[in-house]
């Protein structure tokens, strides 16, 4: 991540803060849980000399797993929303290699039974501005600062290797909600960015129901996709999420 990108993100978020301290505040919590289903997960470490292999197809497969996400935030003066998101993910892989795999400086020989872990935990701070809010449509746009704490491990054939990766990524953030009845709405929610270093997308499409004022439930499909291609690490993955969420107004 280039330093000027981080500085620009911090500056943009900082410029949004003045004037909000004395505005009306409505806080909320959002909890989501469901099932994470692996799509693809292609790995080559180091990115220029390692063996390209998949954690989800061929001799190695990755099992689906439960997941959860938590958001805590507040809306100021009706149009300004800030929130923190915790979104951990841990997937387990296993299989028998059909050829040698060079991973993170070690060689895992063909015929070895291997186990692996793919961990992708993210912590996010998001600001969104409600630029349109009518009876039928609500639209918000903003920025997210995402802290990535990720790791890939491989064990077997007398070898164990782990590659960890921590970084800060700025993302564009937006949501669109179409209220097609007084209580029902369709929600499209996303954090995403693509650059020459890689890409990241977290997109959800959900059906939302307003149970009562300050309490709403949703059922939806989420996709998390992205990765990077560098001399040190090549990794691109896609994970599907089927989940239900509950939005609660706190005060």
Stretches with model-predicted labels:
Residues 22-89, 245, 249-251:
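Short glycine/proline- and aromatic-enriched beta-strand/turn motifs that initiate or cap beta-hairpins
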Residues 26-28, 65-69, 120-124, 167-171, ...:
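Transmembrane beta-barrel architecture of outer-membrane proteins
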Residues 31-33, 70-74, 125-129, 143-145, ...:
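Residues on the lipid-exposed face of transmembrane beta-strands in outer-membrane beta-barrel proteins
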Residues 39-65, 88-120, 148-167, 195, ...:
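Extracellular/periplasm-exposed beta-strand and loop segments of Gram-negative cell-envelope proteins
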Residues 79-82, 135-137, 182-186, 214-217:
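Repeated loop/turn-to-beta-strand initiation elements of outer-membrane beta-barrel proteins
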Residues 135, 166-168, 191-202:
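Solvent-exposed loop/turn segments connecting transmembrane beta-strands
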Residues 183-198, 223-224:
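Transmembrane beta-strand segments that form the barrel wall of outer-membrane beta-barrel proteins
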Residues 199-251:
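Predominantly the C-terminal beta-signal and adjacent terminal strand-loop region
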